[in-house]
Regions:
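SAM-dependent transferase fold signal centered on methyltransferase-like domains
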Residues: 1-266
Length: 266
C-alpha cells in the first residue's frame, strides 16, 4: 500500500529495524501506537500534544465524513504524524483514506518508506518542495480533506497554495515557530510575514495566535472562502491553529477582524 516518489513499492518492513549493528544508535522511538526510527533529522518529542490533536481531528473527520478522504502531511520529517494517522485515526476501511506524506529532504525517503511500510491505508511518499507539491496537486484537481503544515519559521508564503489545495470543509492544521515577530519583538518581521504589527504585551501568546488566524482569514477571503477557527494553542515556542475552510464567507465573518489597543498608562 506504499508508493514512493520513484514509484517503487516499499518492502523494508519492521524487520529492517532489527538489522542495526551493535553500537550504532538507530534513534528508535515510541509514541501512541507508533513505533518508528527517527533518523538523523530534526525531531521534537515535546511536540507530542500537537500530534495528539492532529490524530484526534483526523479520527473525527474519518468518522463523520463520508466517501474517500485524502490527508497530507506536508513537512513530514520522520513520518511520525502520518504513521499515527494510519494506526490511530483510521479505524475502519483503511482503503478509504489516502495518505500523502512529503518531506523536502530526499535523504528522508528511506526512513519514511521504512516507517510507513506496514500501514494498511494507501500511502504516497514524496520528497518535493512544498509549493511544488501543492501546485501540482491543484493543477491535477487533487484536493485534500486534511493538511498538516508543521513549518519551521513563519509559514506565510505557503498559506495561499495550501488553501487552494484544501477541499471545501477540509481542515488545515498550521504551526509556526516564529515567536519573535507576532509577539512584538520584531515589528518589521511581523509586517512582512503577517501584514500587521505586534507589540510586546502581557497576552503576547494569545495575540500571536490571533495574528496567525487573521492572516489565514485574509488569505481565505481573497479566494472568496470562509474560515472557521476550531482550535488554537501555544506553549510559547510554537503557535498552532486549526481551521476549517468553508465554501463561502458567513454573514458578518469579516467583522471579526480588527485591531487591539492597550493603554500603557493604566
Amino acid at each position: 500500500a506504499l508508493v514512493s516518489a520513484s514509484g517503487h513499492h516499499g518492502s523494508a518492513g519492521w524487520g529492517a529495524l532489527a538489522d542495526t549493528a551493535l553500537g550504532i544508535p538507530d534513534h528508535h522511538y515510541r509514541e501512541g501506537s507508533a513505533s518508528l526510527t527517527l533518523g538523523s533529522g530534526f525531531f521534537r518529542p515535546d511536540s507530542r500534544p500537537s500530534r495528539d490533536c492532529s490524530v484526534l481531528l483526523a479520527r473525527h473527520q474519518q468518522r463523520t465524513v463520508e466517501g474517500q478522504l485524502r490527508w497530507l502531511d506536508l513537512m513530514a520529517g520522520c513520518g511520525i504524524r502520518s504513521l499515527r494517522w494510519g494506526l490511530e485515526a483510521v479505524q475502519a476501511k483503511p482503503e478509504r483514506v489516502e495518505l500523502w506524506v512529503n518531506d523536502g529532504d530526499p535523504d528522508r525517503l528511506p526512513c519514511l518508506e521504512n516507517n510507513l511500510s506496514d500501514l494498511p491505508s494507501p500511502v504516497r511518499i514524496s520528497s518535493q518542495a512544498a509549493e511544488v507539491l501543492l501546485a501540482q496537486a491543484y493543477l491535477e484537481g487533487r484536493f485534500f480533506d486534511l493538511i498538516d503544515l508543521d513549518a519551521f519559521g513563519a509559514p506565510g508564503a505557503l498559506i495561499q497554495p495550501v488553501l487552494q489545495a484544501l477541499r471545501f470543509d477540509g481542515m488545515l492544521l498550521l504551526a509556526s515557530t516564529d515567536g519573535r515577530s507576532p509577539t512584538g519583538h520584531d515589528r518589521a518581521g511581523a509586517v512582512r510575514s503577517l501584514g500587521a504589527a505586534a507589540r510586546v504585551h502581557p497576552a503576547s501568546w494569545e495575540l500571536a495566535l490571533r495574528h496567525q488566524l487573521g492572516l489565514l482569514a485574509r488569505q481565505a477571503w481573497m479566494l472568496g472562502r470562509g474560515l472557521q477557527p476550531l482550535l488554537c494553542f501555544s506553549e510559547g515556542r510554537t503557535f498552532r491553529v486549526v481551521v476549517r475552510m468553508r465554501r463561502q464567507l458567513q454573514p458578518g465573518e469579516e467583522h471579526h477582524l480588527g485591531l487591539i489597543a492597550r493603554c500603557e498608562a493604566c
